[in-house]
Amino acid sequence: ACKNRYLKWVVGGDNGTQYSRCPTPATCNLVADVYHSTPAVIGNPSEGLRDEGYQRFASSNARKRPLVLYTSTNDGFLHAFKVASNDPADSNDAAAKVLTKASNELWAFIPPAVLPKIPSEYPNVHQLLLDGAPIVRDVPGSTPSAAGATIKLERNLKSIGTSESDWRTVLVQSFGSAAPGYFALDVTDPVAGPKFLWQLI
């Protein structure tokens, strides 16, 4: 029962207690404070690299990815907000549409290392749980031919310029002043959501 109340509190639901992050729709505030986490704004791949694999990657993502702002908040979440569409046709797509009077949040992610610390802020204690600045880069890799195999963020001479050559957009962030350590997400398709890659603590 306590676990369920806590989970409802984290996402802003009515947890049946006097403590709520959304007392009323007009006073709902699920985004905590941003302190040292300088936002990163990322759109289409734009690096002019003379690499066949990268050119395929840039072409396949051209005018597809919305402009996304990444920042973390001290309640332990990394947030992804859609700030602009790169394709006018996206205005007909509910997932890609940017609303001027809404948060336009695509998703929020809690690194595994932060999860055990979140109960310390319940019901209303300010903590520095995630305070680093995200860095986003396009990273070369190779896709093994086996079905269901994971992408390796590394390359060798054999894979360059072949069908195994692949690129991903990867976000790496430290935990900042909250704790030592780093985590990484694959944010190649921000609308579909992030893929957790690793964490170092």
Describe each model-derived feature in a short phrase.
Residues 1-201:
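A fold-level detector for beta-propeller and closely related beta-sheet-rich head/sensor domains
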